Amino acid sequence: MFCSCRKENRFEWQVNQRHMEVSLNKESDSLYVIHLNTDQPSHSVWKLPYPVYQFDYGDVTGDGMPEIIVGVIKPTRFDPKPDKRLFIYRIADEAYIRPLWLGSRVAQPLEDFRVIREHTSVLIRTMERERSGKYLIAEYAWRGFGLDLRDI
């Protein structure tokens, strides 16, 4: 697999001799659309009816196919205040965008994140806000279903 990020909000890769490209398009202030284009006739889209503050990729599951990692701002059933959340989407059957993990929270309220691809296992490094107002940096790894706190 070869993967590169050539422009903001767009990345592409080769896997099994197939070319794939993922992009994020802003349709309005509260509607973003993830597009998956392949060298096949199929085209997959996933609508995000929330503001997006971050868009990245990385093979967090270790299966050889990059996942799409998106930071959205939205409320949840148990936390009605709109806040920053972390969503992870997988590429199913090398053709379709599907949710893998729609995280309502990490350990503390999320401020920002970055995907760390330098390690053998891809990590998600977050900046989180403590109740005291201080910030902490944490690293998470994929553990079957969901993110597991690896280091602070």
Model-based region annotation:
Residues 2-152:
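Beta-propeller-forming repeat regions
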